[in-house]
Amino acid sequence: MFLVLQLEHDSQFIVHSDVIKNQDLITYFERVCEENDRQLIIKSHPLDIKSLKIKATTQVAYSCVKKISREVDYVFTVNSSAALLVLETTTPLYLLYDSIFAHDKVAEKISLNDINEIISKNEPQQNISQRENFLNYIKNNYLLYGAGFSYDKVNIRQKSNQIMDIV
């Protein structure tokens, strides 16, 4: 299992998560991997300088997200833009909480409570051609106009208040 981390104070993390800490995510995933006899690989955000406590069985990745994604059974992240690299592979992508990348047959929005069931069923509902179509949309439309257009004003105000509380 591959866990791609996001900066905790990044707007994507704040907007799309339940403001859980990366250390909490790691601890949770380490427990799930132990219970299911799985190997955990984590990749911190390149700008994250915080020290994380990991078990000896957890690997820290330094190479490309896309390369690692090709070698694992599942990828999990909190709306990291690195998800775009995963979408270029055939590996199932699971997005914790809300995400701009969560679309039917592209990548699945989940909560932490869903992970054990995902591993036990091992039946991802994702489709490569739909991923390709979604990537084309992202590259040709979404990125041209900006992410903010996809939110209503109430949501933008709420999230900007959360950001200001941190600052």
Question: In which residue ranges do the predicted regions lie?
Answer:
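Catalytic donor nucleotide-activated moiety binding site of glycosyltransferases and closely related
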Residues: 26-61
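Short loop/turn segments at strand-loop or loop-helix junctions that form parts
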Residues: 1-10, 44-45, 98
